[in-house]
């Protein structure tokens, strides 16, 4: 009679890896009967799927073939070029060239507006005023630019009104052609530019261009008048900025002297003088004086 070692544990026979078994001490025989009744069948692998890259390549090839087919049919049809004809027997202009000229004009338009208006003087004076106050980025650049633009429209209102009444409105009503309208508008802008340009700057650019002297100021071409006007605007803006800077500079010097006398050399004079400069600017109504002086510098001439 064979003795069974109590320490020896009977291990279950290897079963299918896909089946789970109960604990060996409780269901060894149950597991064996289940294995005999339903033998393990190997799992069938699923159908191989087409790679995603292959499908994307197929879609791209189909789109490319469709595009080539459409391009070939359009070329075979021979579509005519789009053109605009002015009047009977007029000149035919390609629409693409007109669009190119219009886009070029729109690109240059902001520079022309800034260079032929009061914007340059106004924005420089406001920037110098902010630096004199020592407020760093207060008011911010967006506020200064908006104020300069609104003040520019206010100053240019008489000139813009004359442009509309004498040039744009008759052209839109069909009373005059495009060329006379451009000539009238150019004459109005010349009057504004000449009225705000120093003679010395005008003579300097005329000599540099090798032209002149001119019998009438209206005979000066825009190629000479525009740089002379910009130079005059810069000079006038710096003169106004110098006058605005002086009182705040005096306050800074007084505060610095007082701090040095008290032995507070580590304390920044700009930090101490800022409240006094703001108080002075508010008491004298500085914004109204600055904006009014800028407007009067154009209208007073």
Curated annotation (Swiss-Prot):
<keyword id="KW-1005">Bacterial flagellum biogenesis</keyword>
<feature type="transmembrane region" description="Helical">
    <location>
        <begin position="240"/>
        <end position="260"/>
    </location>
</feature>
<keyword id="KW-0975">Bacterial flagellum</keyword>
<keyword id="KW-0472">Membrane</keyword>
<dbReference type="InterPro" id="IPR005837">
    <property type="entry name" value="FliP"/>
</dbReference>
<dbReference type="GO" id="GO:0009425">
    <property type="term" value="C:bacterial-type flagellum basal body"/>
</dbReference>
<feature type="transmembrane region" description="Helical">
    <location>
        <begin position="264"/>
        <end position="284"/>
    </location>
</feature>
<comment type="function">
    <text>Plays a role in the flagellum-specific transport system.</text>
</comment>
<feature type="transmembrane region" description="Helical">
    <location>
        <begin position="99"/>
        <end position="119"/>
    </location>
</feature>
<feature type="region of interest" description="Disordered">
    <location>
        <begin position="1"/>
        <end position="24"/>
    </location>
</feature>
<dbReference type="GO" id="GO:0044781">
    <property type="term" value="P:bacterial-type flagellum organization"/>
</dbReference>
<dbReference type="GO" id="GO:0005886">
    <property type="term" value="C:plasma membrane"/>
</dbReference>
<keyword id="KW-0813">Transport</keyword>
<protein>
    <recommendedName>
        <fullName>Flagellar biosynthetic protein FliP</fullName>
    </recommendedName>
</protein>
<dbReference type="Pfam" id="PF00813">
    <property type="entry name" value="FliP"/>
</dbReference>
<keyword id="KW-1003">Cell membrane</keyword>
<keyword id="KW-0812">Transmembrane</keyword>
<comment type="similarity">
    <text>Belongs to the FliP/MopC/SpaP family.</text>
</comment>
<keyword id="KW-1133">Transmembrane helix</keyword>
<keyword id="KW-0653">Protein transport</keyword>
<feature type="transmembrane region" description="Helical">
    <location>
        <begin position="64"/>
        <end position="84"/>
    </location>
</feature>
<feature type="transmembrane region" description="Helical">
    <location>
        <begin position="143"/>
        <end position="163"/>
    </location>
</feature>
<keyword id="KW-1006">Bacterial flagellum protein export</keyword>
<dbReference type="InterPro" id="IPR005838">
    <property type="entry name" value="T3SS_IM_P"/>
</dbReference>
<dbReference type="GO" id="GO:0009306">
    <property type="term" value="P:protein secretion"/>
</dbReference>
């Amino acid at each position: 009679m064979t003795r069974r070692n109590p320490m020896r544990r009977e291990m279950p026979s290897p079963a299918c890896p896909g089946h789970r078994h109960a604990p060996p001490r409780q269901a060894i025989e149950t597991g064996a009967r289940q294995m005999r009744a339903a033998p393990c069948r190997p799992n069938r692998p699923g159908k191989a799927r087409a790679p995603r890259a292959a499908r994307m390549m197929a879609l791209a090839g189909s789109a490319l073939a469709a595009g080539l087919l459409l391009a070939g049919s359009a070329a075979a049809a021979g579509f005519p070029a789009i053109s605009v004809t002015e009047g009977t027997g007029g000149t035919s202009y390609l629409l693409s060239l007109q669009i190119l000229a219009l886009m070029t004009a729109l690109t240059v338009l902001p520079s022309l507006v800034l260079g032929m208006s009061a914007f340059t003087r106004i924005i420089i004076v406001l920037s110098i005023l902010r630096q004199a106050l020592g407020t760093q980025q207060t008011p911010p650049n967006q506020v200064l630019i908006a104020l300069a633009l609104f003040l520019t429209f206010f100053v240019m209102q008489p000139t813009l009104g004359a442009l509309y009444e004498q040039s744009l409105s008759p052209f839109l009503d069909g009373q005059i052609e495009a060329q006379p309208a451009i000539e009238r508008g150019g004459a109005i802008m010349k009057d504004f530019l000449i009225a705000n340009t120093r003679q010395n700057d005008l003579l300097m650019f005329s000599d540099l261009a090798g032209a002149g002297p001119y019998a009438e100021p209206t005979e000066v071409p825009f190629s000479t008048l525009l740089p002379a006007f910009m130079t005059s605007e810069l000079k006038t803006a710096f003169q106004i900025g110098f006058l605005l800077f002086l009182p705040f500079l005096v306050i800074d010097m007084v505060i610095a002297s007082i701090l040095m006398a008290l032995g507070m050399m580590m304390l920044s004079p700009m930090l101490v003088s800022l409240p006094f400069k703001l108080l002075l600017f508010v008491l004298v109504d500085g914004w109204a004086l600055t904006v009014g002086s800028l407007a009067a510098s154009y209208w007073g001439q």
